[in-house]
A protein has these predicted regions:
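Metal-dependent phosphoesterase signature
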Residues: 77-111
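Generic structural "secondary-structure junction" signal
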Residues: 35-36, 87, 157, 165
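A generic alpha-helix surface/boundary motif
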Residues: 37-41, 76-77, 92, 96, ...
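Short, flexible active-site loop motifs that bind/organize anionic cofactors or intermediates
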Residues: 29, 84, 128
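C-terminal cap/substrate-recognition subdomain and adjoining C-terminal extension
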Residues: 1-16, 22, 96-97, 103-165
Length: 165
């Protein structure tokens, strides 16, 4: 679910002032923050961005398997191939496609999330989405939820605004 610090950390800067930190709350995406996995939604986003034109053979089966048992070595290998698919494609197009599907992900958020977010905010903890999903895909979703930060896979982008693969 979430990991957070229950203790307050103290740091004494060089000027003698004392800072306090209440930690942070980290939430994973698939089958934690979301009721299922995000793969099917992001596959649709990739098609919207022009990274693929149609579902690959066995796609529905793979997404169903991931929703049921989680990450496996084959599914991780498939995810690694996404960077190859992204090579030469526009970061802006991927971000725009992710923005178009973000509300579908918001609809999948677990019922506990609002109360958990409020508890952490009240305690002064920033809320962070932590996922291996590419940043450009999850950032619009995190923004919709009002999260404070995102820790995610980042693809390099060339000067022309396209992924370098």
């Amino acid at each position: 679910m979430s990991a957070s610090s229950n203790s307050t950390a103290f740091h004494e800067p060089a000027d003698g002032a004392v800072e306090t930190h209440n930690g942070a709350a980290f939430f994973d995406l698939d089958r934690t923050l979301l009721a299922g996995a995000s793969g099917e939604v992001f596959a649709d986003a990739m098609r919207l961005a022009g990274l693929s034109s149609k579902p690959f053979p066995g796609e529905k089966l793979l997404f169903g398997l991931f929703n049921t048992i989680g990450e496996t070595l084959p599914s991780m290998a498939l995810a690694r191939q996404a960077v190859t698919l992204a090579k030469g494609h526009s970061q802006a197009a991927v971000s725009a496609a992710a923005d178009q599907v973000a509300d579908r992900l918001v609809a999948m958020v677990q019922p506990f999330a609002d109360a958990a977010f409020e508890m952490h905010r009240t305690a002064g903890r920033p809320i962070v989405l932590a996922t291996t999903t590419p940043y450009d895909l999850v950032k619009p979703f995190a923004d919709r939820l009002g999260l404070d930060d995102v820790v995610a896979t980042r693809y390099r982008v060339r000067e022309d605004g396209n992924y370098d693969g």
